[in-house]
Amino acid sequence: MDTVVDARGLACPLPAVEARRALAGVPPGAALVVLATDPEAPIDVAAVAADAGWSFAAERNAAGWRLTLRRPELGRPAPV
């Protein structure tokens, strides 16, 4: 099950701060989804994913951004 952080309405760097706080609670192979409206959020949250060694994908929609950080499975590196 994915963990969702609703950071809509928060200005950067707060979406990235909230994402970093949530990392520890995500099990291997699962995803952390950050919902954000700040246009800089994809850049900051991508840096959080890179620092953690997790994969990252950003999707723009009518409500803002859906940013997905996926924790690697145990014993597997994150996809590049």
Predicted regions: what is each one?
Residues 7-59:
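Amphipathic, hydrophobic secondary-structure cores in small proteins
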Residues 1-6:
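Right-handed parallel beta-helix/beta-solenoid
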Residues 46-80:
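C-terminal structural segments of small proteins and small subunits
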